[in-house]
């Protein structure tokens, strides 16, 4: 009975472990392999099992000694122990049958509730043993380990009340007899076993080998034999057996890595030169139930493009590379495959075309030296030199995951002559083109056309020989399997010709792109040079349109030395230059050739592209449709705006004068005396070239006779001495329009001029683009191309030959313009009396001169404002001022208007204080002002006269002498005349001052106030005549002779001049307003504020951005909120108004209704271009402060005129403008 009780006590534990194992397997919880348990725990369990066996053996021996009854008891204990041991290794079916057998006994306890002392869970995992039986790790642990917890039995009622109710229902399937034959139970067992098998399955399905075709990488240095054959590669997926074999050596580490969330390797391989056969990567969210899912190779790892043990082949020794060969090789092969050339991998988005099969090396085979050699870095200061080799299939090692790649054999021979190879390649290409005419539309024809251009550039003649180039056909297919469901096979076929490039010329220091040397020109002086007709050529266009089309001369534009020559099929003898023998020589663009004046082409409406500058490369030199359209537009504009075209031409082109001296008739007749060119033509108002003797010109010509840069030196020297705004001899602007050339009339006219000047040496010069002086004729005389025809108002047709209307050098016009062009022309005609055929003045030049004068005057309405402030009158020489009750006024006269100041009393003593201001509108820089002092007085009617009276003294004695006493007294008498009547004019004028305003004076008072003193002179005082004074006849009084003007007082005045710089500029009325404007400007500049504002608009659109704003005067600078770096500057001078609370914008100033809703709390800045920028502050108080400050700044904008800033700077910093 005791043994049965023990068996019943063990039954709940067995059922608990069984049900717990079923629940855990159904819910697919994570399991831990027994191999992952610590070795110490395993050893302890084995020791405990051995100890239990020893106890059982001892028990048996004791049972033999005690007797039958005790032996039976021992046997039961042994059976129980053996049963327990057997349960630990029994499969699930045996345990379940045992549990069903126990169902007959009454069940007192339905479940066991454990109170764990340690929270470490116990997870079971089923393993497949060698004999095929299922073993539970939990059963082994339960039988061998001592439990570290205490158990408390609970009844079935408590289990239903406090725990999940369906637990008992699940137990009933195993404990109740009515559910013993449940058909779902075998299905459940089968599902569990199937899940165990799939979880421990180690043989994943192997992928089929992948076959794909890639295009070979183009070599860095193209050689004459370049294969464009596609490469077909077959790749096998990594074998799982190799992975398992590699993991078998480290079984414990492999088992630990199965459920690890940490990557296998701590470093990340970025160069992909690492062998990945033994690596298994598990992501953080992946499951480890399936071993196939543990294979986490990346997409590109399946192809093993970078794995393998292939050796890096060495490149052949190639000839020097030039630019032309590189251009021709860039189009030799066209990739027709779209498999790997455009596809990118899923992981790193790296094109598969970037991998080079010839450089793929495994990790175990790549050494440090090999990695350095793979970079192919040449030695410094020299080109890489590669040995000759032969590329075949045996020269490449085969990796474990890649099939052998077959290449066409390419042989490189460095001993072959370069010139012979070039001819052979050209012959092969021409023969291929002739033999395959149907391939004209293929990309090869483009290559052939490119090679044809290369042949022309290299100067190789065309050779026609038939030679068929072999064709290689490549079949490529790509097969791969996606998740075992898709099989996609693509076949591509492409014809690829074997394209051979011409060998490159050797590179010695600086390689040449042409057969001929750029810095070595052949001597062409034998090509029909005539010194008497050598022409001054300024650009290529004039050469093309002026030379005669024929075989009598050689055009420099078609010369072998010209940059614009057509590509010649026969090249000149090539010359090789080394670094030591190189000597710099300026390139000769064109040499002197025969140039006949009579062969000039008359102008027509044909397509002629002429330039006004000295550009050697004219972008319109080609006769294309676009250039014709541009030329037609230029002609149309010239016809519509003839004078504007002339004006623009004068402004755009810098005039330059030839410093050339002309020698008369014969050299022997040249005068030895020095010629004063200023005295020769000074009466003609002509400006000549700087004096230069004929000997200097002739010697310079002989020194530079064999050089073609003589003209360039003269042109450069003339540019330095050139001036703008040149005039012709008759005082008008030079006309740069061209016309027909009458050489005979020109020569006749010049001869007549020289004859009238007594055959003195006359220096002739003009603009380099206007006058053509034949340098060759300077030996015998001079020859000038000049047109004597009158120029119409319309723009004449342009011609490659340009001229001016005078043979003399022009001179800058004088400051004082002539009153009438007719009078000026008449004076010039009188000077040139000997001329029978005087040149006429160009009507276009006259019109342009008048229009320029009108333009200067109409641009600004005046020259500014002149302000005068009268301060005081000092040292007034006038008596009895108080008796005459005198008053004064100042009369101001500017020649157009007369203004009088109010009448004021004259103080008897001291200076007269004044505060009167005048404004003068300066219509010119020379203005005369008159200020007159007038006095109004009252002549006295009576005059106090001193009288001496004798007053008798009373006698003492009656008969004494009478004595008198003298007494003086003043007696009022009638005034006969007044002294002031001889000092004033009839209108009361007493003194006058004349102020001559000129440029010097304006310069002293420009943008600043100066105190000036002007003397008043009395010009009306007459001589005193006593007779006339006695009679006092007024008519006779004014007939008296006047005295010489004398100084009677001085006037102190503050003067300022504000010149006008803009027609929209506004000036105040007086100096007081000027000072007030300057004060307001200073007040505006002193406004400062800073803080954070939210901005929307301007450079911030569609959002509110917080910025740190700094206000300095009229500049609002927005800084970054964090870094405080300036980002935007807002000019508040352009702000028209500010809209804040209670003030809204209407019309164009309001953008839309949405802005009103979203930015209703913001204040807005309205600019002159109707742009609105919204601002808002962090609080209403800060917002109100910003609005007040910005409003004051905007209101002061009206005081911001151009002159205010200059006046302010002058007062503050004493800057003179």
Swiss-Prot record:
Its main location: other. Gene3D superfamilies: Pleckstrin-homology domain (PH domain)/Phosphotyrosine-binding domain (PTB). GO terms for biological process: axial cellular bud site selection; protein localization to bud neck. Residues 430-514 are annotated as: Disordered. GO terms for molecular function: GTP binding. One of its GO terms (cellular component) is cellular bud neck contractile ring. Residues 437-468 have a biased composition (Polar residues). PROSITE patterns: PH_DOMAIN. It is found in: Bud neck. Residues 470-500 have a biased composition (Basic and acidic residues). Keywords: Cell cycle, Cell division. InterPro entries: Bud4, PH-like_dom_sf, PH_domain. Residues 1086-1195 form the PH domain. Signal peptide: none annotated. It holds the Pfam family PH. Coiled coil: none annotated. SUPFAM superfamilies: PH domain-like (SSF50729). Belongs to the BUD4 family. PANTHER family: BUD SITE SELECTION PROTEIN 4 (PTHR36100:SF1). Required for selection of future bud sites. Cooperates with other bud site selection proteins to recognize a spatial landmark during mitosis and they subsequently become a landmark for downstream polarity establishment factors that coordinate budding and cytokinesis. Involved in the septin organization at the bud neck. This is Bud site selection protein 4. The gene is BUD4.
